[in-house]
């Protein structure tokens, strides 16, 4: 099913995807009738990230644009939706959806251009890593504000999750600039395995 060097790794992939997809769905149904705007935004973000994970897992069976550009765009929207949810926890302000849409379209345009120029594994990887590290850092700081206001242990877990995402993508960007090549998550080498496990654990925590 998955392009992995061993069936055990395929099983790990399947297990991680099941958790990423089913846990938010289970929480949604358990909280049926108690969804406010903030929780709806958060669950929408979780659904977008689950979509990213599915496209990533099946990247070798999908067209490049769908697997990488669309998957990365869903990740950008994941950060925007979760940011909107946390912002609603802190203050009653209007979410700048128009700006989010424009920024996402700009991201897709740049990412598609780099892919078309066959630069996805160099400049494309660097561009994605920098953007994701920055977005995760913004969400980490915002989540820390929510955690301090409500003294929530769950928010502390989310702070760790966004912090992990930010650090991992920053390291990946650094390795792309100063290393011989970037870290491709499905290379199944030392760095790629560490990155993949950390991303899975952080994503599961968010669920």
Feature-to-residue mapping (PLM):
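Short aromatic-rich membrane-water interface segments that cap or initiate transmembrane helices
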Residues: 3-10, 188-197
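Juxtamembrane segments at transmembrane-helix boundaries
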Residues: 20-39, 53-193, 200
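Hydrophobic transmembrane alpha-helical segments in integral membrane proteins
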Residues: 1-21
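Signal-transducing coiled-coil linker helices
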Residues: 197-207
């Amino acid at each position: 099913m998955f392009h992995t060097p061993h069936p055990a790794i395929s099983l790990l992939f399947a297990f991680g995807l099941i958790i990423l997809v089913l846990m938010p769905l289970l929480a949604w149904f358990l909280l049926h009738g108690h969804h406010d705007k903030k929780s709806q935004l958060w669950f929408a973000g979780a659904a977008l990230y689950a979509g990213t994970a599915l496209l990533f897992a099946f990247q070798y069976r999908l067209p490049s644009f769908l697997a990488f550009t669309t998957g990365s765009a869903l990740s950008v929207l994941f950060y925007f939706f979760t940011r909107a949810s946390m912002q609603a926890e802190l203050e009653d302000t209007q979410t700048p959806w128009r700006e989010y849409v424009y920024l996402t379209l700009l991201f897709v345009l740049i990412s598609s251009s780099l892919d078309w120029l066959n630069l996805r594994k160099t400049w494309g990887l660097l561009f994605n890593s920098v953007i994701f590290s920055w977005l995760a850092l913004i969400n980490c700081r915002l989540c820390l504000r929510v955690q301090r206001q409500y003294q929530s242990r769950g928010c502390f877990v989310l702070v760790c999750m966004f912090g992990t995402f930010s650090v991992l993508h920053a390291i990946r960007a650094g390795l792309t600039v100063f290393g011989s090549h970037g870290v491709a998550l499905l290379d199944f080498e030392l760095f790629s395995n560490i990155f993949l496990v950390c991303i899975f654990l952080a994503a599961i925590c968010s669920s």
